[in-house]
Amino acid sequence: MYRILLIVLILSYMVTTGSLAATPKKKPAPIGPAVAVVSVQDSFQIEPLSAGVFAAIAKPGGSATTNAIFVIGKEYVVAAGAHMTKEVINDLRRAIAARTTKPIRYFVLAHHHAGYTYVDFDFPTGQDVLMSWQTWKNIDSEVREPEYSSMFFNEGLTLKPGGVSVVLTNIGKGHTDGDIVVFIPEAEVLFASDLLYINSVGYMGNGYMTDWLLALDFLEQIDAKQIIPGYGPVGDSEDVYEFGQFFRDFLTEVLKYIERGDTLEETLANFDLPQYHQMDGYEQLIQLNLKRAYGDLSDNFLP
């Protein structure tokens, strides 16, 4: 299946939207050393990865709960992220404004967790928000109605903000249904959002376990030089492999309990992965993740 997704990525690179000249052209600022630029916002630590490509890493204890990315093209800016409260949106906009006067033409919503109407609904009026069709269904099903302009797609889409390509791929089921990853081929930078956690067990409460494993295989196949996870520092393909190894060990252990007929309650009482105790979020999230994995695997593997 990941081979099919890889083909989708290549095909999506061929489907482009044209650049719109919203501001006078200026020479892009030279890339500086990988240090944060001071700006009036508290959510993100900004790290330049390549000319015009920036990782927005969620600060510990800050308002942001997941990382983001933004790309400054010759004509406009593309930003991407998830779990966006009004404060986090404004902080990301401030971080971008500290580096360019070009407009944010598109914001890519990487995914949305159904039932959470305090996030992903406060983009400014007039902001174009791109998402997968599955994410749009989640947004559209909420009690709260979005006031921003939305566009959604099926498999893939490539944006051309000027001098760089921003390739969007709809992974389908993984962390949620309709996860989007963002690849900048010229910089070999990949934004994986919450499909990837580095040094963390992550949140799996809406995940699709076997599909998620296939998605991780797909991310490895891209072989990006720098990968922005949903949580943790900027990494590379080795970090995808390591998270995938944890994920496989986790699911293998869950299946052992299911196959011997243990109930969910018995599994929760006895489950343990001592070799991963040091990972961030283990104590807080492992049982929640276990409930989701037990239910998902039971539905798919039990006769």
Question: What is each residue range found by the language model?
Answer:
Residues 52, 71, 81, 96, ...:
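Divalent metal-coordination and catalytic microenvironments
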Residues 25-36, 221-223, 234-303:
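Accessory terminal helices/loops
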Residues 19-22:
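Boundary at the C-terminal end of the N-terminal hydrophobic targeting segment
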Residues 47-94, 180-184, 189-192:
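Conserved beta-strand hairpin/beta-sheet module of binuclear metal-dependent hydrolase folds
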Residues 30-31, 48, 76-78, 82-86, 134-256, ...:
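Metallo-beta-lactamase
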Residues 5-16:
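Bacterial N-terminal signal peptides
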Residues 94-160:
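Active-site HxH/HxHxD metal-binding segment of metal-dependent hydrolases
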